[in-house]
Amino acid sequence: MSYNFILFVVFIFTLVIITKPLGTYIFKVFNNERTWLDWFAKPFQRVYLLILGESSKKEQSAKSYFFSLLSFSIMAFIFVFVVLLLQGLLPFNPQEIKGMGFSQAFNTAVSFVTNTNWQSYSGETGVSHFSQMLALAVQNFVSAAVGLCVAIVLIRSVARHEATKVGNFWNDLGKAIFWILLPISIIIAIVYIFQGVPQNIMAYLHVHTLAGSDQIIAQGPIASQEAIKSLGTNGGGFFNANSAHPYENPTIITNYIQMVSIFAIAAALTYTFGKWVGNTKQGWMIFAVMLVLFVISLMVMTISELHGLDFLHSKNIQDIYGQVGHLSNMEGKETRFGIFNSTLYNTVSTSASDGGVNSVMDSYSAIGGMMAMLNMAIGEVIFGGIGAGFYGFFMFLMLAVFIGSLMIGRAPSFLGKRIEANDMKWTMFALLISPCCVLVFTGLAAVIPSVHQALTNSGAHGFSEILYAYISGSNNNGSAFAGLAANTSYLNITIALSMLIGRFGVIFAVMMLAGSLVKKKRSSQMSEISSLDTTSFIFSVLVFFTIVLIGGLTIFPALSLGPILDQLNLNF
């Protein structure tokens, strides 16, 4: 227990310590200020902008920015889709892995372009080295950069006033990659290599084990992909076992680095926001609410796994475990990590849009699995994905401002800008599109016979497997209850559609809100008239309950049919 507590304190301390310097660095990068990595990034940026030409020089309106983002994502999708279809004909394929089928290639291309990294294939047997390096790993960078760009646009729109432009997508994209994602990923990858993570393009090794059997040991460019997998909150593993595999996550050090890197940029953006709008207390308030939500989720998931089998005491097996005070659920968990390292990792992963796991989610207790679903279903606003976590949280922040202002009889405003009906329409659109997507697709899948055949469990847990898949897809997480055999045409197509709607539907609403906010006047008198202190403890509590009630209750009926009923079936 003391080890678990120390690990928790060190993790939180690390997160707090890196938030200000990294947040300041991100602020400087996107404000064209001098940084200590200019020597590395500027040569890449010059070549990149030279190729783009005039399109990278002029600032864009919110609509123009969105359409540039969308056109880039469409081109990226087509490229990845074609590579996956034709990978059997392409080089760097020593295992002679065949091209994917249409529905699986469609699903995978959508998955990586939307920063979801849902995988209906086994990484080491379904994708060649060429596809891993040129298609999937590249998307890990650019899809993460797209999310960061959207967050930066939203921050700019709050900071600027009486303007029409929100920045240039192509310029922002290069800054996100060359100044932030690429250099940090290189450092992390080097550390991983020294920790024992392979980085090569060798054919798989055939070895004769001490037990007398033959075994195939997969090889590949793992360290480079693993670094951006966590930093970019992508989550798609080189191996089917993801970060439970010793080649992806060999030591307690790599496990810790992965957890910190998942939250690093998302946490830093809270300080970036505060610094940009000239009110760092506002940024720390956002950080604090996120942290409280995270701690509560972690506590519930950890307790449910530590005591997840206590109900078996009533099943007359207490003599077997009589010397143990409680029965912990170690099924599906690496013994080298134990329960707390597993629940900490998976809480981080499902709170962000990462989706990587170091233990099997389908083997968690019903309540443990439910907490993972809730982390995703509330929009992954507990730090969240790179960029996506911030703009998702901002939607709840806007709603809390609106509710709080009306409760005290004041005109809603935030940081001196009037919040009007049109702003709230886009806010609610962003908040409701993913839950609607989850409920509609889950309801349809629940009555499709082919989906039933893809389940390894029936009843409440089987429904939980379906529900988890669409929550994960719609919120661009990518983790899964492995009991669902997802490589069917129906599941590949519908989960891909949920990923597209959940990603670009929300981004569209955020960009429209940004376009509205950037045009508004900033009035110090408006802040005084509103009299709603958005950095106060009371407002923090309001934001907290807005997230819990609006985000949590939206999905509660579905959770009642899944993990909650599953838990009740175990107890009674």
Curated annotation (Swiss-Prot):
In terms of superkingdom, the source organism counts as Bacteria
Coiled coil ranges (UniProt) are: none
* Subcellular location field: Cell inner membrane
The keyword Isomerase appears for this protein: no
Q: What is its main location?
A: membrane
Keyword field: Cell inner membrane, Cell membrane, Ion transport, Membrane, Potassium, Potassium transport, Transmembrane, Transmembrane helix, Transport
**According to Swiss-Prot or TrEMBL, what is its membrane topology?**
Multi-pass membrane protein
What is its quaternary makeup? The system is composed of three essential subunits: KdpA, KdpB and KdpC.
Q: Fetch the NCBIfam families from UniProt.
A: kdpA (TIGR00680)
Q: Which family does the entry's similarity section mention?
A: Belongs to the KdpA family.
Q: What is this protein called?
A: Potassium-transporting ATPase potassium-binding subunit
- Annotated organism of origin: Francisella philomiragia subsp. philomiragia (strain ATCC 25017 / CCUG 19701 / FSC 153 / O#319-036)
Protein's gene: kdpA
